[in-house]
Amino acid sequence: MHLPEPDPARLAKKEAAVKALLAVLPRECVLHSAEDLIAYECDGVSAYRQAPMAVVLPRSTDEVSAVMKILHGLELPVVPWGAGTGLSGGALPLGDGVTVALAKMRRILDIDLDNGCAVVQPGVTNARISQAVATEGFYYAPDPSSQIACSIGGNVAENSGGVHCLKYGVTTNNLLGLEVVLADGEVLRVGGKSLDAPGYDLMGLLTGSEGLLGIITEVTVRLLRKPETARAVLAVFDTVEASGQAVADVIAAGMVPAGMEIMDKLAIEASEDYAKAGYPVGKEAILLIEHDGPEVEVDYLLQRTEVVLRAAGATEIRVSKSEKERLLFWAGRKAAFPAMGRISPDYYCMDGTIPRGALAKVLGKIRELSGSYDLRVANVFHAGDGNLHPLLLYDGNVPGELEKAEQMGAEILKLCVDVGGVLTGEHGVGIEKRDLMTYQFNERDLDAMQYVKCSFDAESLLNPGKMFPVLRRCAEFGSMHIHGGKVPFPELERF
């Protein structure tokens, strides 16, 4: 993927920008030396790197607002940065822009158990919210695999899911309110501690907007009571396709587990070597299922689940006998991504979502593509809601390997759309899927999205070059369109 050269006219504003930023932030919160910027060259997609012109680390909403007013006045682009764990290049810096990193905004501002919510700054990690209320018997439901590191602000920007999103929903289903700083520094508040508010669902619009509409500075999250009982099932299958069909069978039987995850042979081996979760090494696939709720209900659901799994061809079924064993089952799954480092120098992670009934077909096609491209694939994903995460293993030191992985990844995502699915489930579009947006959306769809973007950010200064596969500023909007699924002037830079 081509990354553009920085605009000399913008680079010429660096000295003025740094001087103005130092007037509203302490020196340690304004980074502009080459050494300091290295840590911000990329997000979780390390294949694409580009150092920003500068990085600022505001500590409050007021400081974010002051920063945005300065950068807006200088007409410099801004890239919001949470924890840098994103997997679509959504936080990839701009060489002629400023990264606004929110790591210093990591305070839990309020815990209101009477109303079942907490108010937190965007730099608070996902897992820390649950840790803060665990002794009171509460927790925050969305649990991405990176929950010990990823920030709640980033979760909102990407509308992150997690292992338990099948039953409890993704980020947008667990939010009550947001505070956002717009491109010109204006502060916007939407929602609150009440369940709903009149008017348009602006909170729903901002959630998943990938930093294109504003910078999240405060989040009110919904807290849930911990279920009385939670138990996990580990089922072994002879093929990945059979495990995929079992997922559809369980849901068709009228059950909605808290979580359903599939891992194939390669993912099993890597995760077991890394996490020692007791996974059956050498088996083709495992399906993890968790039921939670009152103990009597969970026991009944486990019995029904076992019947369905055996009918679907499960060769072995284990049910967690203790909380320690349940957590161990999930520890292996959540270690899958970092475990890939033991078997491959690099991986390229896809994020398409498909109807559950198409799981077997799509998994079979991915197996075929793996052979065609001569790239190993480790499948590990949220099976309950059809959110695929095939990890394409490659070596970035070998010329052409990254490009081959990109091409194969594009074919997988197109396949997801072809069977009635979508390009992304929780990782976002970023730059990774940007040029595939024309495959899922027509010209009118993209026009509507661009109009929304322009209404919030008329100068296109917030995270430019992400999500939209067209080269245009909002002032030029309407002068260039997509025809026949293709972008005109493809040779032009798109940042």
Question: Each predicted region: which residue ranges?
Answer:
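FAD-binding subdomain of flavoenzyme oxidoreductases
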Residues: 107-261, 479-483, 489-495
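Feature of Fe-S/electron-transfer and energy-metabolism proteins
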Residues: 1-15, 35-42, 55-63, 69-73, ...
